[in-house]
Every structure is written in C-alpha cells, then in structure tokens.
C-alpha cells in the first residue's frame, strides 16, 4: 500500500512540475479612474481560438500570466465604468530564456461622465476599440504597442471631449 501511495505521490509531482514549466508572459498592470485606483474589477481574456478565461482582481495593481504564442484580447470590466480593451500577441522566440514583463496602465472612464457628454455615442464608439496591440519586438528584446499612434489619437480625442 505504501508503494502505491509513493508512486501516486511521484506521479502527482511530475504532473505539477510539468504544468509549472509552461512559459508565460507576465503582465503587470494598474487600473485607475478619475478618482484614483480602481478595485474589484474583472479581467476577461479572450483567446483567438474562442476560449474565454475570467479573472477577478481585488486590487488596482495586478499581475497576470499569459501563455506564450497566443493572440489575446484583454477586457477590463468594472461596474459603472466603460469597458477598456487591449490586444496582445504573446509570440516570443523559443530560445528566449528570460521573457521580459510588460507594464500596462488602464485609465477607466466612469459611465456617468460619458453620459453627460452631448456626443456620448461617438465617445462610446471610440472606446470600443482596443487601446493598443502589444507585440514582442525581436530587435529590442522588449514589448511594443504597435498601435501607439492610434492610441495617442484616441486619448487626444477623449481628452478634447471631456474638457
């Protein structure tokens, strides 16, 4: 009986160690709004194959581990705020030993503030788009937002509308 339990224990350890050897991209992010840090929000991971995973975050600062070699749409969902999105392509070279983390900042907009604007439909339509598309830059060994100019344009339009 002891031998069977020992073999079962070793088998479980091998399964756990195999699962922890998967490579991940570490996303460090902070979620704020006009009043400070946002707590108790949901992060929805939508994978290119249709798989959806949901994580509840208690604090504004959160770390998310995403598997490599996937295209993922992240949605930050919080009650009384407009949902924000960002697309991430986690493809990295197979021989890369250390995968650098990516730091992300989300500034959520309260739905009450948007509803007070005369052009609220245009603002909501702007906010439907992902704020960026993050990919790994092989030359610089870092992560880049390949839509940074688009992101800057959206942010300028939003600031202009909320003045």
Predicted regions and their residues:
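A short, amphipathic beta-strand motif
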Residues: 23-35, 60-62
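Bacterial Sec-dependent N-terminal signal peptides
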Residues: 1-28
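Short Pro-Gly-centered beta-turn/loop motif in secreted/extracellular proteins
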Residues: 63-73, 79
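A short, solvent-exposed loop/turn motif at the edges and junctions
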Residues: 77-91
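Extracellular beta-sheet/turn segments enriched in Thr/Pro/Gly and aliphatic residues
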Residues: 90-130, 136, 145, 152
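Short, ordered, surface-exposed loop/turn motifs in non-cytosolic proteins
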Residues: 25, 34-48, 131
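Short, acidic Ser/Thr/Gly-rich low-complexity loop/linker segments typical of extracellular
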Residues: 49-61
